[in-house]
């Protein structure tokens, strides 16, 4: 249904700002990184790039820029960047980021990401880049945090450069 809606609106985000967190959750859960990235790249109304092209420094209340231009309360799109592109997701069975899933979803055309997420234990860092058809990942976990790491199937080589790696 979302794909059909995006097609109907010529690839644009087809929800209001209140619907963005719902869309974002669906995209992350269904690993539809290209779907979201294609919508984010649309330069005209309605969309985030439209806001940026019109000098926005915060999320607007309405896609067209009417009314408040400082309306961060519905900025659910940020979740997509650190949960999908960065790949940092909390394990709902172990609240408080005691255990996290590291599983980057790499949209076509994106070649790197530097992602941090503050947790009660400290900063979780996932930096990755594509180089020569190889995915290079750097993951830093604070003491007290465990992670399950999943590498996208397109990139199957793994090389450990840190003190320990348990697979």
Residue ranges and their predicted role:
Residues 34-159:
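Non-catalytic C-terminal accessory modules of carbohydrate-active enzymes
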Residues 22-30, 82-87:
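Well-ordered alpha-helical scaffold segments within catalytic/enzyme domains
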Residues 10-15, 27, 68-69:
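Alpha-helix capping and helix-loop boundary segments enriched in small/acidic/polar residues
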Residues 1-20, 38, 44-45, 59:
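Extended glycan-interaction surfaces of carbohydrate-active proteins
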Residues 14-17, 30-34, 75:
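Conserved structured core elements
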Residues 1-2, 156-163:
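Conserved small/polar residues in nucleotide/adenosyl-binding loops
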């Amino acid at each position: 249904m979302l794909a059909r809606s995006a097609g109907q609106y010529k690839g644009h985000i087809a929800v209001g700002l209140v619907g963005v967190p719902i869309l974002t959750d669906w995209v992350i859960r269904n690993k539809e990184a290209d779907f979201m990235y294609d919508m984010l790249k649309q330069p005209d109304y309605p969309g985030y790039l439209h806001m940026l092209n019109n000098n926005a420094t915060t999320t607007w209340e309405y896609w067209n820029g009417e009314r408040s231009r400082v309306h961060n309360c519905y900025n659910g799109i940020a979740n997509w960047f650190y949960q999908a592109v960065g790949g940092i997701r909390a394990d709902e069975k172990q609240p408080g980021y005691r255990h996290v899933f590291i599983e980057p979803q790499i949209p076509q055309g994106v070649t790197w990401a530097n992602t941090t997420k503050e947790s009660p234990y400290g900063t979780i860092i996932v930096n990755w880049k594509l180089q020569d058809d190889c995915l290079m990942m750097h993951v830093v976990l604070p003491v007290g945090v465990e992670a399950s790491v999943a590498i996208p199937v397109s990139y199957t080589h793994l090389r450990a450069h840190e003190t320990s790696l348990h697979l």
